[in-house]
Each structure stands twice: as C-alpha cells, then as structure tokens.
Amino acid sequence: MIQQESRLKVADNSGAREILTIKVLGGSGRKTANIGDVIVATVKQATPGGVVKAHDVVKAVIVRTKSGVHRADGSYIKFDENAAVIIRDDKTPQGTRIFGPVARELRDKDFMRIVSLAPEVL
C-alpha cells in the first residue's frame, strides 16, 4: 500500500530513479494506492541525460508493492520493493523499457503497453 510521502523506485528508463508520492488519484480523500493505481509524484533522483529531470512532477502507475495483492483464485503475490512506471496522460509509459516483473493486475486496468514491454508478468 502506497500513501502520501511514500518513496518508490522507478522501473523504466525514463531517467528517474526514485519518486516521492504527492497524491493518490481516483476519488475524494483517497489515502492509499495499490498495484495498478495512478499517483502523482515528484522525481527525487534522476540519471543525467534522461527525459525526466529531478524535481519534475509526474504521473506514475504502481507495478510492484511490498504489501502485495490478493487475487480472485485465492493466491497472494508480494514483491521485494515498491516500484512504479512513469506514464503520460494517455496511460502510455514515458520510457521505452520496463525493468523487472510486473503484476498481472495491470492487464485488467488497461495498461497493456506496460504489460507488453515488461520482461515478466506475474
């Protein structure tokens, strides 16, 4: 579960390395976000020469969480880190590559471009 002020690793090659959550989108007074939810964040660390610079305000979708997610078949999946992918307004990723596995729940929430770029979908 991701909330305001949570720091996440960035799982793409957009130029950002770490982001800090400003707001969870999707409802009035919503406090937490899980896999597949969109957040507004600021870039805390960035690589030189990247598309995204430090201190930029961006939108991102969460692809991995330590808290995990329950599935309809009764299974439960957790990851070792909290990670997100920076997206544009039309839900397409800013970068051209995705690093690490992503959850299958992104397919249900219409992030098909992220699912197709990911090396592994769990």
Curated annotation (Swiss-Prot):
Lineage, uppermost ranks: Bacteria, Bacillati, Bacillota, Bacilli, Lactobacillales
Name of the protein in its database record: Large ribosomal subunit protein uL14
Single GO BP term: translation
SMART domains assigned: Ribosomal_L14
Task performed by this protein: Binds to 23S rRNA. Forms part of two intersubunit bridges in the 70S ribosome.
Domain of life: Bacteria
CDD domains reported for this sequence: Ribosomal_uL14
KW Disulfide bond (keyword) present: no
Gene Ontology molecular functions: large ribosomal subunit rRNA binding; structural constituent of ribosome
Record Pfam families: Ribosomal_L14
Any GO CC annotation of this UniProt entry: cytosolic large ribosomal subunit
InterPro entries, sorted: Ribosomal_uL14 (IPR000218), Ribosomal_uL14_bac-type (IPR005745), Ribosomal_uL14_CS (IPR019972), Ribosomal_uL14_sf (IPR036853)
Annotated keywords: Ribonucleoprotein, Ribosomal protein, RNA-binding, rRNA-binding
Assembly and binders: Part of the 50S ribosomal subunit. Forms a cluster with proteins L3 and L19. In the 70S ribosome, L14 and L19 interact and together make contacts with the 16S rRNA in bridges B5 and B8.
Stated family: Belongs to the universal ribosomal protein uL14 family.
